[in-house]
Amino acid sequence: MTQTAHPDSVLIVDFGSQVTQLIARRVREAGVYCEIVPFQSAEEGFHRLQPKAVILSGSPASTVDEGSPRAPDIIFDSGLPVFGICYGQQTMCMQLGGKVESGHHREFGRAFLEVDRDCQLFEGLWSSGSRHQVWMSHGDRVTALPDGFEVVATSSNAPYAFIADEKRKYYGVQFHPEVVHTPDGAKLIGNFIHNIAGIKGDWSMSAYRQKAVEQIRAQVGDKRVICALSGGVDSSVAALLIHEAVGDQLTCILVDHGLMRKDEAAGVVAMFREHYNLHLLHVDAADRFIGELEGVSDPETKRKIIGRLFIETFEEEARKLGGADFLGQGTLYPDVIESVSFTGGPSVTIKSHHNVGGLPERMKMQLVEPLRELFKDEVRALGRELGLPDSFIGRHPFPGPGLAIRCPGGITREKLEILREADAIYLDEIRKAGLYDAIWQAFAVLLPVQTVGVMGDGRTYEFVCALRAVTSVDGMTADFYHYDMEFLGRAATRIINEVRGINRVVYDVTSKPPGTIEWE
């Protein structure tokens, strides 16, 4: 996260809601920079960021319980506009002199709001007497308002569903405007930001790019940077941004573990060397990785072997270069947001990149993380700003351990080659059908099962290939893609005819939950 004040920003105080990140997404979509801070460090975050408005999140906690989370007093003493969502509304009311009780009539799911009076937050959106769908998820509810507040909208089970103190620019809602099930929610948040707080909404990837380049130059100076390039979108965008800032001071290392998709490593190397003039080392470590993985069937053991070998290989190559002062990483904002424990102290969970986890400490390097303020879709937008083609930016997610976790059971070179060919044919058919961009992720899985088949006049005993395709918004939940049978038949026929070693193809129709997207 940024360490300095950020003009025209919004501070989001997180009380532990599972959808707090959606609030940040809605603010960013309105063209405004924001940061999420846990309630325990909200005062420090307020002083550091110097925001122009504050949003208080929901929470699984109950405001009536002793020791439940509170917003720091400075937020209400500052004179800034405040928007309380669900628990945020309740704690705002309690802290300003109102009352909250445990609800006898809980509200979960779709509800309808009756607008009782006009409100500045409704400008161009809602009017008195209108009715609107919202999404509720609360047990407690406000029973008495603080001085200065008025009810502006109600629902059947929430007489204080939408309250406002227009003079102080305080607003509280019992529903969740940040979720898609509240159709006008994003517009309400936009009205709060633009109309109430007066923030322009001119934060863009172009402006972010310029600022990031300046910050990288100031941090790195004339020192050297190395970056682990995986071929994925995150590490690629980070590398291009660092390269724009410091040029030849950056060296990228692509450790090819032999577990990538067909022709993937060669394509990445060609693109970055030929089109972006990046100093890139392509390290062919396939024999090293596959040699240790052969016969290993436990998925967690596979991951640990791959992670350890990656660090060892990367470290060896970095030392051959004479080392570096900085390590570039494609860390994203969701990776660094602190998780909130509303029952105790802050529970900080910072995910390290699966490839370079322990490298900064081992090699005494400082991190350069130019994407750590961005969400995934913003990274893609920045990639376009930097000139990466849509065909690269829009690629489906690919796991760090690669094909190793799409080959359940023991791994062999032969199995990986069979899988690689089947996967390439499957993706080719998806692109030919114009379906690639409609699918979140699609891939082939080579099962550790052989079945009897007949090809020509001969009997075969070969592997089963499972095809997987899902639709999703964020990868947290997913549904299987509903192909027509003609497409599946065409893809299966090509795989069986063109890939020696497969004689049966099946399609995975499992959603997440209960299944996961990947098989291992």
Curated annotation (Swiss-Prot):
InterPro entries assigned: Class_I_gatase-like, GATASE, GMP_synth_C, GMP_synth_GATase, GMP_synthase, GMPS_ATP_PPase_dom, Rossmann-like_a/b/a_fold
Keywords for this protein: ATP-binding, Glutamine amidotransferase, GMP biosynthesis, Ligase, Nucleotide-binding, Purine biosynthesis
Domain of life per record: Bacteria
A single cellular component GO annotation: cytosol
Protein's pathway: Purine metabolism; GMP biosynthesis; GMP from XMP (L-Gln route): step 1/1
The reaction(s) this protein catalyses: XMP + L-glutamine + ATP + H2O = GMP + L-glutamate + AMP + diphosphate + 2 H(+)
Its job: Catalyzes the synthesis of GMP from XMP.
Name of the protein this chain belongs to: GMP synthase [glutamine-hydrolyzing]
